[in-house]
Amino acid sequence: MRLVIARCSVDYIGRLKAHLPSAVRLLLVKADGSVSIHADGRAYKPLNWMSPPCVIAEEEGVWRVTNKAEEQLVISIEQILHDSTHELGVDPGLRKDGVEAHLQVLLADRPDAVREGLTLVRREYETGIGPVDLLCRDADGSTVAVEIKRKGEIDGVEQLTRYLSRLDDDPALPHPVRGILCAQSITPQARLLAADRGIACSVVDYDALRGLEPSIPTLF
């Protein structure tokens, strides 16, 4: 991971245009290729970001970050106050709480509860940056990656986006790979971002799933 603290301005050029005026900010460049711009506020949320895969071109005083859709972040750097790179190694990942772990078990037995026609290929399919909860196939034989959360939020969409970018490069899988964020509830912000990323959303009833026998069909 590369950490850069710099006085900079930022322009987003894509479907919309956005501008961050000059200020001191933290630039995070992660090993997965993502770039995010942070202020000393907003908790963990960046002011702007570019999800992987993307290409970073560093010129004198300017970074140009371009993704597959040809959207760009143009970071104009006036002064660098700190620049360091750290090797963090492979992260073991976040352990799911009891509900999320149990949901994964239940939905592995009943993938049709996520979306009609899904069949399970494998649980915990490794992507190289962490395992996606369920790898499935739909009725047409297409690959579907399902990420399971107790509550679906923006972080879950970002996580699934990173997994999908890796799965799209997996030669063992039929392409393209679609994504579904599955949770007991999903926030409006997460739904909006998911729709923008081409990710479907599925809400499941944990209590109902716990009471279902595998032989009993259900509609959600």
Curated annotation (Swiss-Prot):
**Entry EC no(s):** 3.1.-.-
Which domain of life, per UniProt? Bacteria
Report whether Aminoacyl-tRNA synthetase shows up as a keyword of the record.
no
What is one Pfam family matched by this protein?
NucS_N
CDD domains membership: NucS-like
Give the main location: cytoplasm
Q: What family does the entry list? A: Belongs to the NucS endonuclease family.
What does the record give as the function of this protein?
Cleaves both 3' and 5' ssDNA extremities of branched DNA structures.
Q: What is this protein called?
A: Endonuclease NucS
Q: Which organism is it from?
A: Parafrankia sp. (strain EAN1pec)
